[in-house]
Amino acid sequence: MPLPTSPLRLAMVAGEPSGDLLAASMLDGLAARLPDTTQYFGIGGPRMIAKGFDAHFAMEKLSVRGYVEALKHVPEILGIRNELKRQLLAEPPSAFIGVDAPDFNFGLEHPLRDAGIPTIHFVCPSIWAWRGGRIKKIVKAVDHMLCVFPFEKALLEKSGVTATYVGHPLADEIPLEPDTAGARLELGLPESGPVIAVLPGSRRSEIALIGPTFFDAMELMLQREPGVRFVMPAATPALRELLKPLVDAHANLPLTLTDGNAQRAMTAADAILVKSGTVTLEAALLKKPMVISYKVPWLTGQIMRRQGYLPYVGLPNILAGRFVVPEILQHFATPEALADATLTQLRDDANRRTLTEIFTEMHHVLKQNTAQRAAEAVVGVIEARRGRP
């Protein structure tokens, strides 16, 4: 049914690049269902802005990783949230959509919901993995949760939270069969011979902590597999500058540093060494063997370990419910360990075939036309609140 003809104003907040990707996919679906006069505004990144989103604050202001690191930015982040809350309470939007960034968004959604503004949250925080107490915040803050993983809906509904499983937009975006040859041609990589994609993260703190270890691991892999080539995406000019000292210090490496497009770099690869995060799901959807790693400051790591419920951190392992790819974390992430594990993933053809089967099944489960499903859920919430004509 059509919505009432009065103008719609949808406030949205995405706090990091993965949220920018998710929100941009939702904007596509909303644009097909809502009037052209609908306004989309709040906090967003370049993908959202490219679709006409009005960003009142820079998304990068919220993109801080780790407990200790975040403390330095708390005053600025709280200031942004308070100002946005003031604006939204003064001129209430038709609905508020928080995209990931739960620590920021739940604190905003709660007072908005109390004021009668419908609140929708896109991406359930991983309460099934760690910090399960956040379910209490969800109950208070969120009218409707949009879940990207299938098992989350039942978990939320047990606590009285209305939820819809919408699938993951990456599963819609990525083809079921990756075009490795086409990606190599596009990136100027040789048609044959082993290629390893290396993704050490996108934040300054991540590059500082794990970048040198990844580069040392690449040196060891080159010694043991002389014909190997490496490809590393630099998502932004700022990231390229962060990587430049490491690239210069390892000038002997046969490394192709690309401008952005991590997905294309991973498509071209035979195996991947990757920092944990959403990018590991992309690697799985591309059907690539991988090694997952991370290093965070000691105190942050201790807090994460104490609040965790699952024995794994990588999304491919979480979705499979078991270890299907290796995870080498914290002080275990030595150059030797990373090189050994990555070369094993590169060379083990039987394991490659098994992973292809596992990841293909995973792809089918997550491929749900997310933009359409998410947009339909949002429109449903707005219609229910405003009343159907």
Swiss-Prot record:
Q: Which domain of life is it from?
A: Bacteria
Q: In which pathway does it act?
A: Bacterial outer membrane biogenesis; LPS lipid A biosynthesis
The EC designation for this entry is: 2.4.1.182
The record ties this protein, via Pfam families, to: LpxB
MF annotations from Gene Ontology: lipid-A-disaccharide synthase activity; phospholipid binding
Functional description taken from the UniProt entry: Condensation of UDP-2,3-diacylglucosamine and 2,3-diacylglucosamine-1-phosphate to form lipid A disaccharide, a precursor of lipid A, a phosphorylated glycolipid that anchors the lipopolysaccharide to the outer membrane of the cell.
Q: Which family does it belong to?
A: Belongs to the LpxB family.
Name the record gives this protein? Lipid-A-disaccharide synthase
Question: What would be the name of the gene that encodes this protein?
Answer: lpxB
